[in-house]
A protein has these predicted regions:
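Aromatic-residue-lined binding/catalytic grooves and analogous aromatic/hydrophobic interfacial grooves
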Residues: 1-231
Length: 231
C-alpha cells in the first residue's frame, strides 16, 4: 500500500512479508534541508537491508565512507562542471550496520532512520559576468551538506518531523475546498477513482483532491530562496 498524505507532506509504504508488517515513512524537511526515511516493522529485529547510491550517469565522482554509518558522494557534471555532493547517514535501533564498498548493510535492526542531504555549487546570479567562469559558482556543497546532516542527526527523527509538519502545515492549511459536503465516496484508491471519473461518474472529492495535490506540489517544489517550480 502506497500513501501520500497531502496534510503532512509525507509518503508512506506499507507491506507484509512472512507475517511481518513493514512500514516506511518518507519526508523532506524544508527548514532542515534533509530527506528523512524511517524503516520500521511490527516485530523487532526484522530490518535487513542494503542501502546504496546510484550515481548520475552524466557525472564523474567518487563515493567514500564517512565514519561507521555514513557515505559521501562527491561529483561534477560532465557537461558544465557543476559540483554536487550527496551525504547519507543511517541510525539504527538494535542489530548491526556495516559500511563497506559504498554500501550500508543493516541486519537484525528494529528500526532504521536514513538522513540524506544534497547540494550543488550553483549560484542564481541575475547579473552574470560571462567572462568570469565562476559567475554561477556559489557555496561549497561539501560544507553545506555536512552542516545540514550534522544538524539533522542531532535533532533526531521526531523533532525533524514536527518541524517539517509545522512548516508545511502553515502553508497548506491556509486553504480548504469543499465542493459538495453531502457526497461521500468512501476510501476508494485514487486509481479506482480516476477510472470511475473517466466513465462519467461524478466524484467531487477527487476534484478537491487534485486541487490540493497541485498546492502540495507547488509548496514542495518552490520556496523562498529556491528555484521556481518550472525549474
Amino acid at each position: 500500500k502506497r500513501i501520500l498524505s497531502l496534510d503532512s507532506a509525507m509518503a508512506v509504504v506499507q507491506f507484509k512479508k512472512d507475517d511481518v508488517a513493514y512500514q516506511r515513512n518518507y519526508f523532506i524537511s524544508y527548514p532542515a534541508n534533509v530527506l528523512v526515511m524511517r524503516f520500521s516493522a511490527d516485530r523487532p529485529g526484522k530490518q535487513n537491508l542494503i542501502f546504496s547510491y546510484a550515481p548520475n550517469p552524466v557525472s564523474t565522482g567518487s563515493m567514500v565512507a564517512q565514519g561507521d554509518n555514513g557515505l559521501v558522494y562527491s561529483a561534477a557534471l560532465d557537461n558544465n562542471g557543476m559540483k554536487y555532493v550527496v551525504r547519507i547517514q543511517a541510525e539504527t535501533k538494535g542489530g548491526t550496520l556495516v559500511n563497506r564498498n559504498g554500501k550500508l548493510t543493516v541486519k537484525g535492526a528494529d528500526e532504521v532512520v536514513f538522513y540524506v542531504t544534497a547540494d550543488t555549487d550553483y549560484k542564481a546570479n541575475f547579473a552574470p559576468d560571462f567572462k568570469n567562469p565562476k559567475t554561477y559558482v556559489g557555496v561549497n556543497p561539501v560544507e553545506t551538506t555536512g552542516q545540514w546532516l550534522a544538524n539533522a542527526v542531532a535533532k533526531g527523527y521526531s523533532a525533524l518531523l514536527n518541524e517539517h509538519y509545522q512548516d508545511y502545515a502553515a502553508l497548506f492549511n491556509r486553504v480548504k475546498l469543499n465542493l459538495n459536503p453531502t457526497v461521500k465516496t468512501g476510501n476508494l484508491p485514487t486509481g479506482q477513482r480516476l477510472k470511475n471519473y473517466r466513465k462519467g461518474q461524478p466524484d467531487y472529492y477527487l476534484e478537491e483532491l487534485y486541487f490540493q495535490f497541485g498546492r502540495y506540489l507547488l509548496i514542495a517544489s518552490s520556496r523562498p530562496g529556491n528555484m521556481p517550480a518550472n525549474l
